[in-house]
Amino acid sequence: MNKLKELRLKNNITLKEMAKKVGISYTYYWQIENKERNLYYYLAVKIAKIFKLKPDDIFYGW
């Protein structure tokens, strides 16, 4: 399981809820989690804020 999905599930957040929090579509977030699209830094910043992490933690582990 990838890091983003693991974080999301650990925090009991659905894919749709996460996409809404980040400000992107459900499909786009799903594609990022499944490595069909690249995770851009500006999205990593938003995701990191949700989980109270640093953006680099999203890319390199927490």
Residue ranges and their predicted role:
Residues M1-K10:
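A short, Lys/Arg-rich alpha-helix, primarily the initiator
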Residues R8, A19, A48:
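The alpha-helix within a helix-turn-helix
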Residues K5, W30-Q31, F59:
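Key DNA-contacting residues within the recognition helix of helix-turn-helix
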